[in-house]
């Protein structure tokens, strides 16, 4: 399956493997999602499938979104996401996407927004070391110099400094699905995923299979 699925992070727990070792897992309520739009190379310039997730009350959705969803005959959905495909004609408008489309042992990439930490200093935000704490030093948690002198005469873009921490989109790659509960639309994934409980997650088949890695800025 080339499509992904949208879900909601429920929290973390643990499972025990065959050797009796505790394995940290994340519980995700994934889907059911509905296909809300099909795009083709002839009409849109590229082939893609758009899906929707999570019902929403009518008074909380605007008229353009309401009209867009009415074309596909779907209920009012809060979240919409698009996935590129080679041929969108293989999919049916209004069809459901559930956890049944995934398999136990499959590797997936999961994207979400990290927990916001507010304004943070350079030590907490970037893990820099502090200054000396004794011998008359007045530089304990100060950043120190952020540039040179006349050359270059400016601060380079991207300089790691204090600022807002978290709230960024992060993708954790190659996470293994340990268990699937079709009755409750649950995916049990090995390890942790971005975001706090209740946050939206985008789950896609892994682009490359290997050790789990994390991509995204602070």
UniProtKB/Swiss-Prot annotation:
Keywords: Ribonucleoprotein, Ribosomal protein, RNA-binding, rRNA-binding. Belongs to the universal ribosomal protein uL3 family. One of its GO terms (biological process) is translation. Pfam families: Ribosomal_L3. InterPro entries: Ribosomal_uL3, Ribosomal_uL3_bac/org-type, Ribosomal_uL3_CS, Transl_B-barrel_sf. It comes from Prochlorococcus marinus (strain NATL2A). Part of the 50S ribosomal subunit. Forms a cluster with proteins L14 and L19. One of its GO terms (cellular component) is cytosolic large ribosomal subunit. The keyword Membrane does not apply. One of the primary rRNA binding proteins, it binds directly near the 3'-end of the 23S rRNA, where it nucleates assembly of the 50S subunit. It comes from the Bacteria. PANTHER family: 50S RIBOSOMAL PROTEIN L3, LARGE RIBOSOMAL SUBUNIT PROTEIN UL3C. GO terms for molecular function: rRNA binding; structural constituent of ribosome. Residues 128-167, 199-218 are annotated as: Disordered. This is Large ribosomal subunit protein uL3.
């Amino acid at each position: 399956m080339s499509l992904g699925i949208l879900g909601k992070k429920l929290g973390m727990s643990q499972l025990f493997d065959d050797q009796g070792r505790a394995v940290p897992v994340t519980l995700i309520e994934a889907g059911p999602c509905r296909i809300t739009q099909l795009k083709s190379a002839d009409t849109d310039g590229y082939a893609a499938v758009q899906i929707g997730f999570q019902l929403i009350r009518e008074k909380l959705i605007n008229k353009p979104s309401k009209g867009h969803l009415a074309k596909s005959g779907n209920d009012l959905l809060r979240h919409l996401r698009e996935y590129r495909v080679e041929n969108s004609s293989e999919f049916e408008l209004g069809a459901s996407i559930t956890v049944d489309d995934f398999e136990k042992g499959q590797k997936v990439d999961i994207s979400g927004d990290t927990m916001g930490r507010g304004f943070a200093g350079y030590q907490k935000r970037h893990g820099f070391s502090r200054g000396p704490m004794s011998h008359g030093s007045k530089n304990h948690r100060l950043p120190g110099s952020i540039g040179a002198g006349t050359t270059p005469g400016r601060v380079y873009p991207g300089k790691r400094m204090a600022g807002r921490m978290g709230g960024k989109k992060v993708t954790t790659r190659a996470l293994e699905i340990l268990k699937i509960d079709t009755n409750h639309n649950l995916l049990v994934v090995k390890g942790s995923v971005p975001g706090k409980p209740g946050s939206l997650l985008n789950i896609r088949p892994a682009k490359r299979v290997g050790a789990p890695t994390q991509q995204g800025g602070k």
